[in-house]
């Protein structure tokens, strides 16, 4: 079971249709995206990586299995891009990383999504808990890195 499938299982258990991931380390872990300025939506209908036009080519290269969404195409608004993804995917209850979302950003997103009858629910440590337990591949890669460093 890969990390996205694990996240989907957790979402299902919490009654969520999808999750909006904003913490840079979590975005990288779940998508493979190596840079900053990106956000991820995971839901059963698909995986989305939101970034701007400077990074879409990089995102397409590093994030197979993700639809890359250029937020510049949505009035240069990340919340509007998120709203579009939720509408497209049929998300009615969206989790978000409450510890990594500013109140200002929450209010802006909540205003848009609530107008579409989409509920936002704060989540904690969904991706972090996956990051704590290392897969065999992650352990092997760490060993290789240690050998190279020696």
Language-model segments: residues:
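Terminal domain-start leader segments
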Residues: 1-48, 79, 84-90, 111, ...
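Conserved beta-strand termini and adjacent loop/short-helix elements that scaffold enzyme active sites
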Residues: 21-22, 69-73, 121-125
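Structural motif
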Residues: 22-24, 51-53, 72, 96-101
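Glycine-rich nucleotide phosphate-binding loop and flanking beta-alpha elements
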Residues: 27-28, 57, 102
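Short amphipathic alpha-helical segments
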Residues: 32-33, 61-62, 106-110
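Short, hinge-like loop/turn segments at secondary-structure boundaries
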Residues: 36-39, 66-67, 112-113, 138-140
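Compact, glycine/acidic-enriched structural inserts
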Residues: 52-80, 84
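Flexible, acidic/His-enriched mid-domain "rim/lid" segments that flank
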Residues: 77-150
